[in-house]
UniProtKB/Swiss-Prot annotation:
Its main location: nucleus. Residues 30-87 form the FHA domain. It comes from Nicotiana tabacum. SUPFAM superfamilies: SMAD/FHA domain (SSF49879). PROSITE patterns: FHA_DOMAIN. GO terms for cellular component: nucleus. The keyword Methyltransferase does not apply. Expressed in roots, stems, leaves, young flower buds and open flowers. Residues 157-171 have a biased composition (Acidic residues). It is found in: Nucleus. This is Transcriptional activator FHA1. One of its GO terms (biological process) is regulation of ribosomal protein gene transcription by RNA polymerase II.
Amino acid sequence: MGSSSGSDVEAGFAKLQGEDFEYYMQTYSIILGRNSKKSTVDVDLSSLGGGMNISRHHARIFYDFQRRRFNLEVLGKNGCFVEGVLHLPGNPPIKLDSQDLLQIGDKEFYFLLPVRSILGGGPPIGPKQNVNYPVAAHYGGIGKKGGLFRGREREYYDEEEYDDDDDDDDGTGGKKMRRCDGAEGGGGYGGYGSCGSSGKASISGQLGQ
């Protein structure tokens, strides 16, 4: 059941994309950290090469229904980087935009949203089941400043459709999306905003087995 098929993709609210892993978010809230004898987390960054500075409960990504957006709550004492800015425990939750680069410990990965979520101003569809699918695979698609991977891309989405109803925010609501050509099963992973914004390096991997 933990595959990267189209049905799993459409049910996902968001995706975490690293250089050597993908994780499809299937619930409204997930915990990132490291597994211990007493408890487990949704995303075990320690096992993915996150290093020794990962707390058991290091961060939480959740959907804010009132503001219709995803947020990152920092729990671990060593904090998290979002787009190169360090955020520490006790700070207000950080708004996450598609293609934001996150770093927890030594692990870097991107936060990606599907186009359906962006167009609708909220999660695309309810989860088919309360399950998360971690997938260790390379997959085409992200672009950021000095991105981790490189590849082909094409524009396919305009930022004006993204309405987060937060005019008093930092103005980072809408972003122009790009989509990778190529990769089996359709380019751009079923419409995830995943190939970077204008003027940024793109990433393209190969679909893992």
